[in-house]
Amino acid sequence: MSTRTPTLPGTRAATDRVPLLALLAPLLLFTHGIVDWVDGLDSLDGLRGLGGLGGVAAARDEGALSVAAGVLLVLSVAGFAWLTAGLGARLRHLPLAVPTALLAAFGAGATAAVWVGQITGLIGHSAPAALSSGGGVLTAVALAMVLVALTVEGHLPAGSLALAAVSVGIMLLPWGLGPLASLVLLIALAPLTRPVEAD
């Protein structure tokens, strides 16, 4: 799935991981949404067994599904941050590679830090929404900036950018449609799963 990019003689060949990341990051987000949904089923009907599957000793009161959902979210945001950095490197005319990579990396780090804080009890689950989802939002903003720049430079179809915007709109709906939004985003990023031709 990864391709080799041409390099100068005597240097190591760089591997383009964008095609793999464009597939993997939305699938991780989809899996997170499904696991999070299943984890929340126990609060719907009073069954105290489905979401808290045995608990993990290091996770205190967290159930195994809650821990798995958190890990999947952190991995997904990290995948989107890495994808943002890889796509930023493809930009030729707009100097957005470094700022977007830094913003995405900060967002991924913030997501991981908040998750670790919640799982260890340093940050309660009643933390403000801006704190608990801020890292993912920063990474999404960085990815959106790179996708717009790629569309402006002609490296990404405008339809893909429109589908990515639709996926953001679906994600913002209050009905927990994260898995659907991630599938729409997977379709939007499909052109990026093809290896890029050397200039």
Predicted regions and their residues:
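Hydrophobic, aromatic-enriched alpha-helical segments typical of multi-pass transmembrane helices
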Residues: 2-199
